[in-house]
């Protein structure tokens, strides 16, 4: 789950769409309204689905996926992955922007993050086994995709 999904959850719970719309949710809200015409329960179903999403996902012993960042203490390699996951806060995983080029390597995991566009908006930035995949498409950069099976990169 990312910060824009959190905007939707806040909107649904508080019936206040200002923050979401201010941060680019207009077309998504319009599409939700259109879907509600076909299925009156669509918004509730979407809420239930998004509420079930995690802010951090661990795939086997290979990958850690999170929207913005993962908190890793200086001695992170002394902890197992479950302890690392327990240290996380959703605010940090959804909003942090202070890790680029300051990240720590955690065991042999490849950490995949987005949220903060990389400076060179034409390719994925890799640093210390962390892959920054936000290539700034919203600002005219590339839309990047990283296929985890073979780490092949695709750009549009």
What are these regions (language model features)?
Residues 15-18, 82-83, 128-131, 149:
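Glycine-rich, phosphate-binding/catalytic loops in enzymes
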Residues 9-11, 75-77, 121-124, 142:
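Short glycine-/acidic-enriched loop or helix-start segments at secondary-structure transitions
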Residues 1-59, 92-94:
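Active-site neighborhood of divalent metal-dependent phosphoester bond hydrolases
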């Amino acid at each position: 789950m990312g910060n824009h999904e959190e905007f939707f959850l806040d909107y649904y719970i508080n019936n206040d769409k200002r923050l979401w719309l201010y941060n680019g949710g207009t077309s998504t809200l319009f599409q939700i309204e259109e879907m509600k015409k076909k299925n009156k329960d669509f918004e509730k179903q979407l809420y239930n689905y998004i509420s079930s999403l995690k802010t951090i996902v661990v795939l086997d012993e290979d990958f850690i996926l999170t929207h913005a960042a993962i908190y890793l203490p200086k001695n992170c390699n002394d902890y197992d992955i479950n302890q690392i996951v327990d240290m996380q806060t959703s605010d940090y995983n959804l909003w942090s922007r202070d890790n680029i080029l300051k990240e720590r390597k955690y065991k042999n995991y490849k950490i995949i993050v987005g949220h903060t566009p990389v400076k060179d908006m034409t390719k994925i930035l890799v640093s210390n086994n962390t892959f920054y995949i936000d290539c700034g498409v919203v600002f005219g950069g590339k839309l990047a995709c990283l296929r985890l099976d073979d780490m092949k990169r695709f750009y549009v």
